[in-house]
Amino acid sequence: MLDEILQRRRYNAATDFIDANVARGLGAKVAFADPDRTLTYAELQARTIRFARALPRLGLRQENRLALLLYDTVDFPLAFWGAVRAGVVAVPVNTLLTPDQYAYVLADSRAAAIVVTAALAKPILAIRHCLPHLRHVIVVGAGAADAAALGGVHRFEDLLVAEPDEPFTAATISDEVAFWLYSSGSTGEPKAVKHIHASLMATAKLMGQGIIGITEHDVVFSAAKLFFAYGLGNAMSFPLSVGGSTALLPLRPTPETVLAVMRRHRPTVFYAVPSLYASLLAHKDLARGAGSDRLRICVSAGEALPAELGERWRAKVGVDILDGIGSTEMLQTFLSNRPGDVRYGSAGKPVPGYDAKIVDENGRELGDGEIGELVVRGPSAGEGYWNQRAKSRRTFVGEWTHTGDKFLRDADGYYHYCGRTDDMFKVSGMWVSPFEIEAALVSHEAILEAAVIGKQDADGIIKPKAFVVLKNGFAPDERFFDMVKTHVKERAGPWKFPRWIDIRADLPRTGTGKIQRFKLREEEAEKSL
């Protein structure tokens, strides 16, 4: 089936992910559950058909863009799959952006319409006059009626009621662009990556089924949000590919809200980013199974998982975390640990169906133990960036995608993250990975999170500087900084210890949880002026 759908032919992803499940008798099964509502496969099919019919009546044609500014509720899959079914390009938008950032994404994408959660509608309505391409605002959720009363705004439910649910799916093809995902902007302005219909099933089969072993009996919960490539696969394409069920959390994940979902829905598979695993481990209520007596596997991506964190989780919760790496450009995870073969501190090995290699700045392939840029190839690679020709040519080179991440491969074939290309720096003439120092820092009992950059000392020599967030209840005394430096020397090496340590309440992160080290470098540069 995978080989077939990757051929250029008539194909719409909604057929495989929704209609096929209804056809095999799963119509009454819950596909999605949020705190207030559930959505069965039959309801998902009927309502996405209605929304797909409504979009052309609003003037949206195939390949027009529809922005989705939605919390993780049942409205997200309805809007996303309705757009896909209609051949309209869905563009999920990070719900944590500022009004200026919303304006940037909406202007850059030239979205003809937006579906927005009522609680997020105010900033969109305030900037609407600056967006000539944005013809329609569609509001969902509690408060939608109040927003619609302002004029020029549609209620999502009103659009659905006005349409029949007679079968309808646009005549798209497998190689046609189905949706865009904006990169998280860990190194600057976000870029829109274009993805095709066939890529969704490719990732579901290779990672979801091939590595995680997801089946129709699984209930999944992803703390990573649906607007994030990682979350889109975790909570939507993976479970829908087999007729599974998904628990959704609209709010930002905290240990309290996550554990509440775990207790209520008892998921079998849990996905998160390393910083959330660290916060959960620091929470007093974390226990065996993390609230779910059915939990069989946990998954991490977004940033590298420190080895000590994975080992503590396994000891406390009784379930391994499969750490891996993916990207918006590749849509999902392409390197991963796997059940029964977990090596903490590594990103695992290539997911079958993907190839990976490490190259130097001239594109020459490097051997084991050598640090270079990770490049990958596989069936889910994006079609390039929207309106970013030069960056597309640098990233998507023939069959290979350049990740911008520094890695090394050990003699056993496991890949180890060393940092972003921009984040690496030399100390005493040797390349230093900020992640290695950060992993040593968070293994200290007082430190919850850490970020490391290179900073010039008084002689103009680059040395490591650390920014740390302390665990609740820890107050540094005069010995703290020397103890931490000694701890890092013992864990990472005597030349890698941070010469300066700043304590912060939090670290700058993207909406998907990645540390923005470039912002810390900018802060230091401003101080030196």
Q: What is each residue range found by the language model?
A:
Residues E4-Y11, I127, A145-V177:
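Flexible, low-complexity linker/hinge segments
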Residues A28-T73, P77-W81, T98-A103, R155-D158:
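Conserved AMP-binding/adenylate-forming core of the ANL superfamily
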Residues T40-E43, A178-A202:
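Conserved AMP-binding A3 loop
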Residues L97, I114-V116, R263, F270, ...:
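AMP-binding/adenylate-forming catalytic core of the ANL superfamily
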Residues M201-S222, F227-T268, H283:
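Conserved AMP-binding/adenylation subdomain of ANL enzymes
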